[in-house]
Design a protein with these regions (language model features):
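Active-site-proximal, glycine-rich beta->alpha crossover segments in alpha/beta enzymes
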Residues: 1-93
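Glycine-rich, proline-tolerant flexible connector loops at the mouths of alpha/beta enzymes
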Residues: 1-16, 45, 99-118, 217, ...
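Short beta-strand segments at enzyme active-site cores
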Residues: 41-44, 97-106, 138-143, 212-216
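Catalytic-face loop-and-helix region of soluble metabolic enzyme cores
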Residues: 130-228
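Flexible, active-site-adjacent loop/turn segments at secondary-structure boundaries
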Residues: 47-50, 67, 106-110, 115, ...
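Alpha-helix-loop-beta-strand connector modules within alpha/beta enzyme cores
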Residues: 8-39, 114-139, 174-178
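Alpha/beta enzyme core
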Residues: 57-104, 114-138, 150-159, 204-208
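General structural feature for long, well-ordered alpha-helical segments within catalytic domains
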Residues: 19-22, 26, 30, 79, ...
Length: 228
């Protein structure tokens, strides 16, 4: 349905924080656990663009629906700025409660054409990255399926980049100088252990001369065997 800009603009910080309080409480409790002593704890936020996509379409987003929304460029930019404001508060509160790294997920960056990336992905994410850096905290970005990770890193300047499984890791290893995370296709976890080991070792070999955090290129699929 239509998005009520006045309703979004009138949301006060107290109401916003009340809904997120369980997250901050969980972060604080995790930090108290002796097992995480001297270890980093990653706080997570969705990027403004991805949050907007879910506001337009709550289920799995359809590119056609998003395209229909592009007609009102003013509305999009206005909502992104409002989301950016509240995300900065959310980031600050995660850090206050113990997060030592922030990761920004832009799960639907890949929906956009190249010409739309500067306004809807690069600029809003850069503003968040600069805010996190001003708090002296490292920041990881995950612009899923953006294809041009090199340009993203040059413009947004995260401390590390999370890659998806649709990009060739060999190209990334040549193009990107900052630490890299992820890349493994979650579907590999649905295969046998031999295939999983082979794929994992391939990533480790490709990034053997590069700062690399082994991880999936997106979330664990619901049907994945936890014992895999």
């Amino acid at each position: 349905g239509p998005i009520d800009l006045d309703k979004i603009s009138s949301v006060d910080e107290i109401s916003f924080l009340k809904k997120l309080f369980p997250i901050y409480k969980t972060i604080k409790n995790v930090k108290k656990n002796p097992l995480v002593k001297n270890k980093d704890l990653i706080g997570f936020v969705g990027a403004p663009w991805t949050l907007l996509v879910y506001m337009i379409n709550k289920s799995s987003p359809k590119k056609k629906l998003i395209k229909n929304f592009f007609g009102d460029n003013y509305l999009i930019k206005k909502i992104l700025k409002i989301l950016e404001k509240f995300l900065k508060i959310h980031i600050e509160n995660q850090i206050k409660n113990g997060a030592t790294i922030i990761q920004i997920f832009d799960s639907w960056a890949g929906l956009l054409d190249k010409k739309d990336l500067p306004n809807y992905v690069y600029t809003p994410t850069l503003n968040l990255v600069n805010h996190v850096k001003s708090l002296k905290i490292p920041v990881i970005c995950f612009p899923r399926e953006i294809k041009d990770y090199k340009s993203f890193c040059e413009i947004v300047k995260p401390d590390a980049i999370n890659i998806d499984y649709n990009i060739d890791p060999k190209i990334i290893a040549k193009q990107i100088k900052i630490p890299i995370q992820g890349g493994l296709d979650p579907k590999v976890l649905l295969s046998d252990k031999y295939t999983l080991k082979k794929k994992a070792l391939n990533y480790l070999d490709i990034f053997k001369n590069h700062p690399y955090v082994f991880n999936l290129g997106h979330g664990v699929l619901p049907e994945t065997n936890p014992m895999m």
